Amino acid sequence: MSKNTRNVAVLTLMVGALCACGANAPVAVTPEEAEATARKAYVYGFPMVMGYKTLNAYTNDTSNPDYKGPFNKVSCAARLFTPEDKAVVTPNADTPYCMFWLDLRAEPQVLSVPEMEPERFYHFQLVDLYTHNFAYVGTLTTGNGAGSFLIAGPDWNGEKPHGITDVIHSETNFVFAVTRTQLFGPDDLARVEEIQ
């Protein structure tokens, strides 16, 4: 028997033995256990399904009335929201919104914010596809000063580039960003639009 034939035979026996070791008997699952597992799967998956539904409406489906634009492009609404605005649950009437989806599959994105008046509240709420609010940039967390924040997906392992204030990691490669800018009254709407 040649050396190659012997090696192939030994390898075949080893693979067969490993496969036999991994064989498991079927696990008996009661209907109650199956239902409990299904409930857990639903609770786990529902936020991602709803997040993707919003992603699709905002970035892909141009016929959808909630369409905002392509990935990585900010869409702002310097106006007062009413009960007719249903894309976001309970929109605020005193913090006009900007919304956008980031696609981090190819590379991180940089969010640069200008210096804000000290008395004006603003923030960027960053939400991953699991609907976890994983970071905020703005008055309550980073202050009202200017800054540049690198938003990176789960696979990015680079060093913080020069000029970047902070690196923010997301669990998912798609991130929903909601910006709120304080409106001091109807006469302030032009200033909010300028900020946005």
Which role does the model predict for each range below?
Residues 22-196:
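A compositional/structural signature for long, glycine/proline-rich flexible linkers
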